């Protein structure tokens, strides 16, 4: 689906690539949109696990988790498959509410964890973790939508990265 997008991928192409029958496809999934929802869920979970692993492996101080994680997430948005599936087709096929709902559990958990380190370091009051997690989730959601729609994704990713650095500088008191 990533190469041709949701609309450009027929169920015939899906069953052929998977080596299954159309009956087997519809036994597991109500329709192509249901299959796509499952693809999105799996991709979000895979990216969240990858983000956690790569972020934890690359930070020296726990309070750097938020910055490093956010910047890695922006880099993931540049991947053509992620861009097509999650950023272009995801909102269009599933609708914004469902698309957001798929991402929220893993993203909010990662944000709360990272913000907790800022609390531990004395750089944020504990009662601001939840509102800040929601604000940052909204900012990242909007940034990812913009990156998905970008005519020049590489330029847009660079500009959003610089803007995110400014936002995090302010949050971290730099």
Regions found by a protein language model. Give the residues of each.
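Helix-turn-helix
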Residues: 2-34, 38
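Short coil/turn segments at alpha/beta junctions that flank glycine-rich nucleotide-binding fingerprints
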Residues: 3-7, 80, 121-122
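Amphipathic C-terminal alpha-helical segment
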Residues: 75-79, 108, 112-113, 117, ...
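Short secondary-structure transition hinges
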Residues: 68, 74-113, 145, 149
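Amphipathic alpha-helical packing segments from all-alpha helical-bundle domains
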Residues: 45-52, 64, 68, 96-121, ...
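Short amphipathic alpha-helical interaction patches enriched in hydrophobic/aromatic residues
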Residues: 51, 55, 59, 94, ...
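Alpha-helical elements of Rossmann-like donor-binding domains used by nucleotide-donor carbohydrate transfer enzymes
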Residues: 13, 34, 38, 68, ...
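Hydrophobic alpha-helical connector segments
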Residues: 38, 52-81, 132-136
């Amino acid at each position: 689906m990533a190469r041709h997008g949701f609309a450009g991928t027929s169920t015939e192409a899906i069953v052929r690539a998977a080596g299954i029958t159309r009956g087997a496809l519809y036994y597991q999934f109500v329709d192509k949109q249901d299959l796509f929802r499952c693809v999105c869920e799996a991709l979000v979970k895979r990216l969240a696990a990858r983000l956690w692993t790569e972020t934890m492996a690359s930070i020296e101080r726990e309070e750097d988790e938020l910055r490093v994680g956010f910047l890695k997430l922006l880099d993931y948005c540049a991947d053509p498959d992620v861009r097509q599936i999650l950023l272009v087709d995801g909102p269009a096929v599933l609708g914004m509410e469902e698309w957001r709902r798929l991402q929220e559990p893993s993203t909010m958990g990662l944000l709360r964890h990272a913000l907790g380190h800022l609390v531990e370091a004395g750089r944020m009051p504990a009662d601001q973790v939840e509102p800040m997690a929601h604000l940052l989730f909204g900012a990242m959601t909007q940034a990812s939508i913009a990156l998905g729609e970008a005519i020049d994704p590489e330029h847009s990713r660079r500009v959003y990265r610089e803007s995110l650095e400014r936002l995090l500088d302010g949050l971290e008191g730099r």
